[in-house]
């Protein structure tokens, strides 16, 4: 039957039986894959040559690898060609010429077979006994799980005990408040330490007039810097530091030798509230303190629009409660510590030193009035100077042809 052809292999056939046999051949399947990939087919001779080359490579891979060792030079090679090149090399010839030989023989090659790599995946029959694996019973599995859970529990308990020990060590950590935070220089008194830190490092305490516990404040700041490696100004906003030197270099480079206090951040201010006492500054327009003290006859009394005083009278005693505004909640929550006379003397001396050094402190009423008068005088002087400047900004010697 004429016209029987294969478009993939470019072959013509005499009958259908020959064509069907061709369709079952590997050569036709290979050309079909090439046709699907958009690549032209190959001839039968080229396909057979490729198949024979692949078979030779497979046989070589199946053969056991050999190791060729030169007894004179003590060198090993995986192929015979590399071993022959070594025998013709200059180093080998020099050793042979120098007379280094074994039992009078110059060229001795030790050829041995290398061990094959162990193949983990082997051909296993479906019905072989190696497929079957013994499985532990439910009781053994439960016992293993219980032992694992107990071991994990013991590990967690030991870890928690170590954490408790670390917390105990942190509580026992003591610090000398008379030691400088930046250079570890010791001083005899708190006052000399504060003056040193301000003079050499630019550190000062804000609102020192209301400070009630200077020793506690310096101890707390020292623990933050020397134990927790934390910047006094950045606090937790900055990346954590690994050592004390890193914290000190950061504070010196960024000029952070100061407290982040009084900038309007309630969280930062609440951290240092317990060391301050602002009760003396709570005054109204008439100069009276907002906090009410004393007994009153009325059961409920509104005081100054900021507090509500409630009194309860009994036969022997009289109790009173004060309800304040939310604006002063942060001050009501204070728990002031008992202050000693020594701390008051230190605060007074430090405030006087700060004033002598030119640092800003809380101004008095007279100073505020003077500042207002100075500002008004400076404003009036500026207006007068501008008027005089406008009038004098005229060219008086004009030429004759200018009428104005």
From Swiss-Prot:
Residues 119-169 are annotated as: Disordered. Keywords: Cytoplasm, Metal-binding, Repeat, Ribosome biogenesis, Zinc, Zinc-finger. InterPro entries: Matrin/U1-like-C_Znf_C2H2, ZN622/Rei1/Reh1_Znf-C2H2, Znf622/Rei1/Reh1, Znf_C2H2_sf, Znf_C2H2_type. Disulfide bonds: none annotated. SUPFAM superfamilies: beta-beta-alpha zinc fingers. It is found in: Cytoplasm. GO terms for biological process: ribosomal large subunit biogenesis. Its main location: cytoplasm. A zinc finger (C2H2-type) spans 4-28, 68-92, 178-201, 229-256. Residues 125-147, 160-169 have a biased composition (Acidic residues). Pfam families: zf-C2H2_2, zf-met. One of its GO terms (molecular function) is nucleic acid binding. Disruption phenotype: No visible phenotype under normal growth conditions. When grown at 10 degrees Celsius, the double mutant seedlings reil1-1 and reil2-1 show growth arrest at two cotyledon stage and die. Transmembrane segments: none annotated. GO terms for cellular component: cytoplasm. Pre-60S-associated factor involved in the cytoplasmic maturation of the 60S subunit. Involved in the dissociation and recycling of other late pre-60S factors before newly synthesized large ribosomal subunits enter translation. Can complement the growth defect of a yeast mutant lacking REI1. Required for leaf growth under cold temperature conditions. Can form homodimer. Interacts with RLP24, RPL24A, RPL24B, EBP1 and JJJ1. Belongs to the REI1 family. This is Cytoplasmic 60S subunit biogenesis factor REI1 homolog 1. It comes from Arabidopsis thaliana.
């Amino acid at each position: 039957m004429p016209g029987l052809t294969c478009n993939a292999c470019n072959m013509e056939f005499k009958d259908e039986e020959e064509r069907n046999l061709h369709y079952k051949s590997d050569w036709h399947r290979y050309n079909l894959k090439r046709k699907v990939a958009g690549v032209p087919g190959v001839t039968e001779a080229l396909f057979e040559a490729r198949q024979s080359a692949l078979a030779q490579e497979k046989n070589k891979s199946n053969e056991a690898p050999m190791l060729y060792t030169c007894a004179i030079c003590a060198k090993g090679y995986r192929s015979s060609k590399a071993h022959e090149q070594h025998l013709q090399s200059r180093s080998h010839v020099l050793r042979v010429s120098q007379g280094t030989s074994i039992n009078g023989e110059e060229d001795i090659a030790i050829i041995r077979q290398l061990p094959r790599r162990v193949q983990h995946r082997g051909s296993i029959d479906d019905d072989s006994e190696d497929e079957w694996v013994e499985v532990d019973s439910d009781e053994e599995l439960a016992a293993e799980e219980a032992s694992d859970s107990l071991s994990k529990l013991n590990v967690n308990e030991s870890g928690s005990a170590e954490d408790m020990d670390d917390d105990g060590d942190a509580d026992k950590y003591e610090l000398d408040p008379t030691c400088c935070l930046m250079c570890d220089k010791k001083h005899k008194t708190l006052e000399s330490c504060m003056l040193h830190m301000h003079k050499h490092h630019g550190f000062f305490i804000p609102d020192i007039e209301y400070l009630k516990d200077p020793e506690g404040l310096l101890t707390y700041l020292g623990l933050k810097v020397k134990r927790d490696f934390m910047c006094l100004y950045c606090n937790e906003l900055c990346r954590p530091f690994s050592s004390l030197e890193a914290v000190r270099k950061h504070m010196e480079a960024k000029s952070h030798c100061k407290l982040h206090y009084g900038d309007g951040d309630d969280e930062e201010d609440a951290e240092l509230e317990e060391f301050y006492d602002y009760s003396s500054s709570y005054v109204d327009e008439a100069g009276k303190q907002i906090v009410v003290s004393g007994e009153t006859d009325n059961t409920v009394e509104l005081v100054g629009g900021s507090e509500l005083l409630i009194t309860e009278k009994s036969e022997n005693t009289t109790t009173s409660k004060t309800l304040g505004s939310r604006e002063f909640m942060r001050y009501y929550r204070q728990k002031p510590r008992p202050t000693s006379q020594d701390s008051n003397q230190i605060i007074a001396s430090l405030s006087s030193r700060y004033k002598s050094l030119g640092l800003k402190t809380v101004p008095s009423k007279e100073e505020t009035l003077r500042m207002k008068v100075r500002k008004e005088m400076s404003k009036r002087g500026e207006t007068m100077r501008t008027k005089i400047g406008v009038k004098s900004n005229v060219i008086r010697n004009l030429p004759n042809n200018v009428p104005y």
